[in-house]
C-alpha cells in the first residue's frame, strides 16, 4: 500500500429529484456494474412506494430510517500483549453514514420480496419504524460495544 498522501475524498453531487447527497449515495450503493440508471429507477421506485404506503414524504421517512440504522459505537480489534481485545470506539460521522447505507442495501438484497424496489421500500419503512434487520444489526453492534466496555481504556 502506498505511503504517500491519502487520495482526496470526492464530493458527491446531490440527486436531481430530491436534491439530497444521501440519496445519491444510496443510488451509488444500490448500483451494480456501473448501471446508474437502473439503480436510480430502483431507488426512486422504492421512494414512490414509501410515499404511497405511508402518505409522508419519502425523503423524511428515509432520513428517519437512516438515523435508526446508523451506529454510534462499534468494536475494533486491538492487539495488546499477545492477545486481541475488542475495543469499543465511537464511529466517525462519515463512517456512520457509510455503514448505515451498506447495512440497509445488503439486508434489503437478502429479503424475500419479489423485486428490489419492494425489498428496499419495505426495509426503509421497517427501519423508520425501528424494526427490521438493519436496526437489529445496529443493536447487535451496540451490544458488542457495551459487552466489551471493560476494554475501553485501550482506546487509541
Curated annotation (Swiss-Prot):
GO terms for biological process: translation. Coiled coil: none annotated. It comes from the Bacteria. GO terms for molecular function: rRNA binding; structural constituent of ribosome; tRNA binding. SUPFAM superfamilies: Ribosomal protein S7. GO terms for cellular component: small ribosomal subunit. PROSITE patterns: RIBOSOMAL_S7. Keywords: Ribonucleoprotein, Ribosomal protein, RNA-binding, rRNA-binding, tRNA-binding. PANTHER family: RIBOSOMAL PROTEIN S7. One of the primary rRNA binding proteins, it binds directly to 16S rRNA where it nucleates assembly of the head domain of the 30S subunit. Is located at the subunit interface close to the decoding center, probably blocks exit of the E-site tRNA. Part of the 30S ribosomal subunit. Contacts proteins S9 and S11. Belongs to the universal ribosomal protein uS7 family. This is Small ribosomal subunit protein uS7. The gene is rpsG.
